[in-house]
Amino acid sequence: SQGVKNIFYPCMSYNIDEKLGDNNYNCPVVAYYPEVIRSNVGELKKLNFMNDYLGLHRPKDFSKKIYGILCNKFGSISFDEVKNASDKAYDEYHNYMKKIHHKGLEYLKEAIENDKPVIVLCGRPYHLDEEINHGIDKLICECGATVITEDSVSPLVNKFPTGVLDQWTYHSRLYAAAKYVAKLADKDVNIVQLVSFGCG
């Protein structure tokens, strides 16, 4: 009813490798849900539903792969434009992750200096949705604690043995954040893991 003709919803087996785990898989729901939707939503047959397999984890190959997908669906387009857009997207992703890391460390330092409790709030990307997290981050802050995310501290930890097959990107972040928090045992820093839908 809204005139949508194209839906781009790629399957992505792998996440960007953060060098924390034995592998860097996306969970099966994230990776393959487009297949489930394509097979079960008949209306999609009337649209250009693009659920090709794509890998963000290999920047050197990404431009060629997305270029092929776009040309196949939309005809001739400029590889240089696709490559330029891809490079800018990766640059922005890395800049964004640096900002999260720096802001988290800024809040952590300020809280420790002011003897405030800190909660490293671990969750999956969908926990950013207030309909799913129910404002738990705000509630924790209202109780007087500073909240930072697991991806703000996980880069401070090198890969380490976990005793499990550590192949999921978000679990790797969780383990790294927990290890970092454990190093701060003399500080009032704790970790809370959000779990929804039976994930994890």
Q: What does each of the following model-derived ranges do?
A:
Residues S1-G200:
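An N-terminal assembly and electron-transfer interface module characteristic of large anaerobic redox
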